Amino acid sequence: MDMHSGTFNPQDFAWQGLTLTPAAAIHIRELVAKQPGMVGVRLGVKQTGCAGFGYVLDSVSEPDKDDLLFEHDGAKLFVPLQAMPFIDGTEVDFVREGLNQIFKFHNPKAQNECGCGESFGV
């Protein structure tokens, strides 16, 4: 499915939603506390990489009219409606890998991922 063309009716879908682990919720709350005016984080997808799609995280000061809100322990995760067919059911985690701390996405719709982990296919 091309994200830039075609239409879908949200009423045709039974969304599972997205979930935040406690670690992801804590990190989002910390980000919001550090940036005046920020209310949460937006998770979207874009066409990129060798597998087709990549995750995009942005700070949110004002939600877009088509954003869906998923909240856990005061942490707000906004998702553009058009991204839901690609990431519905995803669990968002925040983990330490060696010296790095990163968001990890456990997406049941991801059929394949590239070797570097930067993109996925559905």
From Swiss-Prot:
Keyword field contains Iron-sulfur: yes
List of residues binding [2Fe-2S] cluster: C50, C114, C116
A cellular component term, taken from the record's GO annotations: cytosol
Single biological process term from Gene Ontology: iron-sulfur cluster assembly
GO molecular function, a single term: 4 iron, 4 sulfur cluster binding
Keyword tags: 2Fe-2S, 4Fe-4S, Iron, Iron-sulfur, Metal-binding
Disruption phenotype: Deletion has only a mild effect on cell growth. However, deletion of both IscA and SufA results in a severe growth phenotype in minimal medium under aerobic growth conditions.
Binding site for [4Fe-4S] cluster: C50, C114, C116
Signal peptide residues on this chain, from the entry's feature table: none
Subunit structure, as described in the record: Homodimer. Interacts with SufB and SufC.
Record's function text: Member of gene cluster sufABCDSE that mediates iron-sulfur cluster assembly under oxidative stress and iron limitation conditions. Binds [2Fe-2S] and [4Fe-4S] clusters by mobilizing sulfur atoms provided by the SufS-SufE cysteine desulfurase system and then transfers the assembled Fe-S clusters to target proteins including ferredoxin and aconitase. Seems to act as a Fe-S cluster carrier rather than a scaffold, this role being performed by SufB and SufC.
Family per record: Belongs to the HesB/IscA family.
Protein name, entry field: Iron-sulfur cluster assembly protein SufA
Gene that encodes the chain: sufA
